[in-house]
């Protein structure tokens, strides 16, 4: 067939859409195509796509693998050391896409705590997602750990130990209201990256650009390793409450 690669990202950024890896692999392999899975948001701690039929797995090691926001790196994993692996490593060497020794050391340092950081941030993200579903200023919460998420059953099958550190939610009142919430957060820092020890927030629509389908009222959270009660308190003081929620007003607190 004409299709050579089927590319999936699961969970997807920033919508948290979940792709059934096993079903995708069955269809792709029947057509003679390979499956490449971007598993950045899961890390190998929560999901190992090769075990579900993927041929290659990609990670932005800049994100949670490193976890300290001080490295630019990536990883490509093959199912076995075969002809495909040889082609990938040959191309990597000739194009010079080789990580520097200091960056490699930083990445190894960060990965020593991976199995501590990922479960903590995932558990905190789950609590935050559940809390946001009850808030009057939030119209929708996107997180595969919620039973209401359309991909929850698939995520349960192919993920273990949690559903990841990233979630998104939509704010009542539109894009301006979402911007006010992001600006009002104190512990969550406004930044584009994700997967570090610090919790981040981003108004995502301007980053994604027009035509991508990302709504203007969507905020993306990357949950770090802070005390989750502090993160919940930060969200509570930034989100409008009561009648203010429908008007997109601010939630003012005493200084």
Task: Enumerate the predicted regions with their spans.
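Conserved C-terminal alpha-helix-loop-beta "cap" of PLP-dependent enzymes
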Residues: 137-219, 223
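Conserved PLP-enzyme active-site core in the AAT-like
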Residues: 1-137, 142
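PLP-dependent enzyme catalytic core of the Aspartate aminotransferase-like
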Residues: 117, 183, 199-255
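Residue-level signal for secondary-structure boundary sites
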Residues: 82, 175-177, 229-231
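N-proximal accessory regions
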Residues: 103-126, 131, 162-163, 170-173, ...
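Anionic group-transfer/hydrolysis microenvironments
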Residues: 11, 40, 61, 170, ...
């Amino acid at each position: 067939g004409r299709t050579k690669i089927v590319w999936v990202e699961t969970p997807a950024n920033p919508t948290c859409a979940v792709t059934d890896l096993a079903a995708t692999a069955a269809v792709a392999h029947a057509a003679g195509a390979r499956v490449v899975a971007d598993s950045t948001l899961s890390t190998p701690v929560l999901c190992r796509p090769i075990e579900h039929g993927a041929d290659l797995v990609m990670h932005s090691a800049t994100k949670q693998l490193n976890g300290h926001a001080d490295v630019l790196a990536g990883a490509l994993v093959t199912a076995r050391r075969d002809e495909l692996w040889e082609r990938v490593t040959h191309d990597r060497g000739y194009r010079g896409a080789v990580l520097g020794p200091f960056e490699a050391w930083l990445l190894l340092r960060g990965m020593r705590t991976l199995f501590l950081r990922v479960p903590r941030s995932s558990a905190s993200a789950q609590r935050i997602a559940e809390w946001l579903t009850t808030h009057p200023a939030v119209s929708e919460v996107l997180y595969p750990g919620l039973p209401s998420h359309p991909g929850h059953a698939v995520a349960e099958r192919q993920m273990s130990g949690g559903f990841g550190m990233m979630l998104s939610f939509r704010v009542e009142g539109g894009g301006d209201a979402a911007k006010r919430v992001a600006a009002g957060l104190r512990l969550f820092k406004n930044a584009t990256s994700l997967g570090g020890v610090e919790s981040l927030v981003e108004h995502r629509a301007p980053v994604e650009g027009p035509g991508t389908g990302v709504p203007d009222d969507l905020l993306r959270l990357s949950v770090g390793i802070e005390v989750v009660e502090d993160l919940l308190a930060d969200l509570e003081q930034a989100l409008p409450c009561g009648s203010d929620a429908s008007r997109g007003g601010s939630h003012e607190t005493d200084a």
